[in-house]
Amino acid sequence: MNLADKVLVVNDNLPIRTDKPVHSGKVRSVYWLTEEDSARLIKDKGYDVPADAPLAIMVISDRISAFDCVWQGENGLNGVPGKGTALNAISNHWFKLFKDKGLADSHILDIPHPLVWIVQKARPVMIEAIARQYITGSMWRSYTKGEREFCGITIPEGLEKDQKLPELLITPSTKGVLTGLEGVPEADDVNVSRSDIERHVKGFNFSNESDIDLYEKLLKEGFDVISDALAEHDQIFVDTKFEFGYVNDAAGNEKLIYMDEVGTPDSSRIWDGSSHRDGKIIEQSKEGFRQWLLNHFPDPDILLNKNRMVERFALASDNKLPESVMMDISNTYVGIAEKIIGKKLHISDNPKQEIIDILRDEYQLIV
C-alpha cells in the first residue's frame, strides 16, 4: 500500500448522519449529530450527560499546520503518517490522568477509533490558556526587543534564551476575535492580562468571576501533572496551550472542563532532557517543524509577519515539502506518543474505511 494511502488528509466528507454543516478546522472536523442520534447514544451508551445534550463526532486528520497554514509533501503525501493517531492518544492519556487525579473532566465521552472522539457540546471560554516554564519562542523574541511585561506580568532582566523562568507564567490570549471589550484589541490571538479578564468576565464567557481562579488552578495543576510525567522519560515540558469550556452533567450541574487537546506536540513545546543539559535543544514537538520552515525559505519574515498572510498562504500552497521532512515529523510525533502512553501505536492502513465501518456497525451513524 502507498504511504499516502495511510494518511487521513480529508476528514470532512465522511457519510456521518448530520443535519448541520460540518465544521472543518485546520486539523479536526466536527459532525454535529441529530437530536435523535444524540439521545439514542446517550441512552444506549450511558454517557454522563443530560438526556437532551447535543453530541458530535470529532475526526482528527493527519494534516500538518504551522504559521496558520496547512503544508503538504511531495509524492502525494499531503499529511503526516500517524500524526492524528499520536495526537489523540496523547490527549486521551493526559485527560484520563487529569480525571484520575481529581482535576476536571474533558469533553470526550467515547473513543470509537484512534482518530475519532464522541464529544459533548461545550460552551468555550474565549481564552487560549497558555502556560510557560521556559523563555523561548515568541516570548524570547519579544524579550530581545526590550519587552519585560507579558500579560500584565513583569519578568526580570538578564534572562537567557531557553532559560527556565523563576515561576510558571500564565500568559493567556484571546480565542478568536472578541468585540466590544474595552482595552482588548479586536484581533485573533491577542495577549490579555488577568485584569482584562476580570473586567470582562462574561465577555470571555466565564460563568462567574471565581472561575477565573479555577481555570488558572486547572491550568497550573494540569501543567504540573504532565511535566512530572514527562520528566520520568527525561523530557522537559516547556510551554503549552490549554482550552476550557462548560458542560452540564446528567444531573444538570454545570462544570468547567478541559477541552480541545492537551499536552500534545501540536499544542506544546517538549524538549529532550539530556540534550538540554548539554546546551542543545532537541524539539519533540511541532516547534522543530516550525524551525525547519524558518530555515528552509529564504525570506522567513513571510512566516512571522501577519501583514504578509497572502504571501504566506501562497508559499504553503506552492511548495511541496520533501517526503523526508514529513517522515521526520511522523517519527517525532509517534515517538513521543509511544513514550507517553508506554506502548506501540496502532496506525491504520485504511483509516477512512475503518472509521466508516465502526461508526456504522457499532454506532449506527452512517447514511
From Swiss-Prot:
Signal peptide: none annotated. GO terms for molecular function: ATP binding; phosphoribosylaminoimidazolesuccinocarboxamide synthase activity. Its EC number is 6.3.2.6. The keyword Ligase applies. One of its GO terms (cellular component) is cytoplasm. One of its GO terms (biological process) is 'de novo' IMP biosynthetic process. NCBIfam families: PRK13960.1, purC_vibrio. This is Phosphoribosylaminoimidazole-succinocarboxamide synthase. It comes from Shewanella pealeana (strain ATCC 700345 / ANG-SQ1).
